[in-house]
């Protein structure tokens, strides 16, 4: 609000328009602080008073998802949830020799991109020869409000942490949970190389700076 007011007073209306268009007018931003790093499940639980009785999405900000079509993956997950009331866990295919680095979903078959299939569970970093599939959890979830109560009752694990995957496993006792295979591309910005990859991919596609960015890359003569 202070930035917007300052830009308006200085009559920098182009910058003001750029700032105000970042967030749609019907969207409100509320920050909730996680006082201690006690796991993803605990972080989600911290937002219980804000979420209330609403179903909700969880998006991990260190994973960027670049959409490959006009209809983005998160929209398709929400649509599937609305149609079936089945929770949605976004997954992507990874090379077989890398499955021991990820949380891998247990499914009867591999769905096509943009489609969902019921999952039996999530196996954390399985051995390569014992992995139930090659579909790794990406960091996008569509979940029902009831998962908050399950998180409250989830036993704490190593490091006194509450894990979201444990609450999802408890949810599967009564509800269908599906793995949604994404169509887009992910960038793990939790790693330095993943962050640099994201900068490159988003840079060349930037509507204003993309062409100049491509020219800069050519100048490097890599």
Language-model regions, residue ranges each:
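Conserved N-terminal catalytic core of the sugar/cofactor nucleotidyltransferase
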Residues: 1-58, 65-66
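Terminal amphipathic alpha-helical/low-complexity segments used for targeting or macromolecular assembly
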Residues: 2-3, 81-84, 114, 131, ...
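Short, conserved catalytic or adaptor-binding loops enriched in Gly and charged residues
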Residues: 16-27, 111-116, 170-172
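Short coil/turn connectors at secondary-structure junctions
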Residues: 26-28, 52-55, 82-87, 174-175
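Short beta-strand segments
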Residues: 33, 58-61, 91-93, 181-182
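Conserved core of the sugar-phosphate nucleotidyltransferase
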Residues: 64-149, 154, 158
């Amino acid at each position: 609000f202070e930035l917007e007011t300052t830009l308006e007073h200085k009559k920098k209306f182009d910058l003001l328009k750029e700032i105000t268009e970042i967030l749609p007018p019907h969207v409100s931003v509320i920050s909730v602080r996680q006082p201690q790093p006690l796991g993803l499940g605990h972080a989600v639980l911290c937002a219980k008073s804000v979420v209330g009785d609403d179903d909700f999405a969880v998006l991990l900000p260190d994973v960027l998802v670049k959409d490959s079509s006009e209809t983005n993956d998160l929209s398709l997950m929400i649509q599937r949830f609305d149609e079936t009331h089945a929770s949605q866990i976004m997954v992507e295919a990874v090379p077989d020799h890398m499955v021991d680095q990820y949380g891998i979903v247990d499914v009867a078959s591999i769905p096509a991109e943009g489609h969902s299939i019921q999952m039996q569970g999530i196996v954390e970093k399985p051995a390569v020869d014992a992995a139930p599939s090659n579909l790794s959890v990406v960091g996008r979830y569509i979940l029902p409000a009831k998962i908050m109560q399950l998180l409250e009752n989830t036993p704490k694990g190593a490091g006194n942490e509450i894990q979201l995957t444990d609450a999802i496993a408890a949810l599967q006792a009564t509800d269908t949970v599906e793995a949604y295979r994404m169509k887009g591309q992910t960038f793990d910005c939790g790693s330095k190389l993943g962050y640099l990859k994201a900068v490159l991919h988003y840079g060349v596609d930037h509507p204003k700076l993309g062409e100049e960015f491509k020219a800069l890359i050519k100048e490097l003569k890599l």
